[in-house]
Amino acid sequence: FQDAILAEGIRIYMPTTQEWNAEQQQQLKEVSIEDLLPRDEISIDMESVVAMLHGKRILITGSAGSIGSEMVRQIAKYCPAELILIDSAETPQHDIRLMMAKQFPEIKAETIVTTICSKSRMEHIFKTYMPDYVFHAAAYKHVPMMENNPCESIQNNVYGTKILADLAVKYGVKKFVMISTDKAVNPTNVMGCSKRICEIYVQSLNKAVKEGIVKGETQFVTTRFGNVLVKKSIDAFVL
């Protein structure tokens, strides 16, 4: 019901419990996403974002997922030279392709259906498109599923991340942003463990590059996401 209301552009208001009484029922307060966050709103330096993304070649893995698809929409607003979008799910990737053609026809976008675990395919993509920045959002994320399929969790999340990180250094990517999860904090399940291993690997690789042990200039950054609030095509991230 709430999704249907929001889809029609109807705004929802909610009073606090202290205000909700017979005398103050008309004193309503608008509810925003920020009201749900247990922290202060983060201020973003938009000039730096524009300078980073404008006219650059951006590779996004997991581009058809809940986080990856919203990254595609947000990054496309800043006029990158090209988006290289990778996902193994054919149907949602096709939806992303149609969305880009409709909403951002001026942006060159390559929608590629493949797995990040194919080293030869990933190397071909890096060699062909030479991305400036990589946003790595591809991962198996459902905890119960990964408990029952631990080998696939390690294969996709860990091995796939290693392939991408190594290729980023090899092909001169400026910055590699890995999307992780709050479940990597003192992990108690297979999925969380797999993402923590990924964090340790890219952190170690970043240190090795800085110290000259590994030749390259790539900077590695990890960001942890908590829950994702999804309202149809509108995703709001809870960091």
Where are these regions (language model features)?
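Conserved beta-loop-beta element that borders a ligand/cofactor-binding pocket
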Residues: 203-234
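Helix N-cap at the beta1-alpha1 junction of Rossmann-like dinucleotide-binding domains, i.e.
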Residues: 87-92, 116
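Conserved Rossmann-fold NAD(P)-dependent oxidoreductase catalytic core, especially the SDR/UDP-sugar
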Residues: 8, 23, 130, 136, ...
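Conserved Rossmann-fold cofactor-binding substructure of NAD(P)-dependent oxidoreductases
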Residues: 110-133
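Flexible, Lys/Arg-rich cytosolic regulatory linkers and terminal tails that connect or flank
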Residues: 2-57, 169
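Short beta-strand element of Class I
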Residues: 81-84
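Glycine/proline-rich active-site loop of Rossmann-fold NAD(P)-dependent oxidoreductases
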Residues: 190, 196, 229-237
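N-terminal Rossmann NAD(P)H-binding glycine-rich loop of SDR-like oxidoreductase domains
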Residues: 57-78
